Structures are given as C-alpha cells and as structure tokens.
Swiss-Prot record:
It is found in: Secreted. It comes from Conus victoriae. InterPro entries: Conotoxin. Residues 1-19 form the signal peptide. This is Conotoxin Vc6.11. Disulfide bonds join 55-66, 61-71. The presence of a 'disulfide through disulfide knot' structurally defines this protein as a knottin. Expressed by the venom duct. GO terms for molecular function: ion channel inhibitor activity; toxin activity. The keyword Transmembrane helix does not apply. It comes from the Eukaryota. Pfam families: Conotoxin. Residues 20-41 form a propeptide. Coiled coil: none annotated.
Length: 74
C-alpha cells in the first residue's frame, strides 16, 4: 500500500510538471507571435502616412498629396 501511495504521488508530480512546461511553451509562442509586425508595417515602416484614404493635410499622405480630403498616388 505504501509503494502504491508513493507511486501515485510521483505520477502526480510528473503530470503537474509536464503541465507547467506546456503552459510556459504556449506563453512563449504567444509572445513570439505578438512581437511580429504586419507585413504592411514592415514594408512601409512605422509611420502613419497613407497611400490612399482620407486626409486633412498633405503630411498625412505618403506622397504629400492631399487633394479634396483624399490621398492621391502621384
């Protein structure tokens, strides 16, 4: 009976250790994916300038061409 109790305790410790290791791996994967930048952000950089879309000033557009509240590619 004593051996069975010890065996069950060892099994419980091993299972809890395995669960903790898997949880840490999941957190590491989440951190890895959260650090990645979207492809558009990698291509254009981290500025907020637009190629197309609405604007209020030339500085908001990539090509500094805000015409009638819209960025134009020229």
């Amino acid at each position: 009976m004593e051996k069975l109790t010890i065996l069950l305790l060892v099994a419980a410790v091993l299972m809890s250790t395995q669960a903790l290791i898997q949880e840490q791996r999941q957190k590491a994967k989440i951190n890895l994916f959260s650090k990645r930048k979207p492809s558009a952000e990698r291509w254009w950089g981290e500025n907020d300038r637009r190629v197309f879309g609405s604007c209020t000033a030339d500085e908001e557009c990539c090509f500094n061409n805000c015409v009638q509240a819209y960025c134009f590619f020229v």
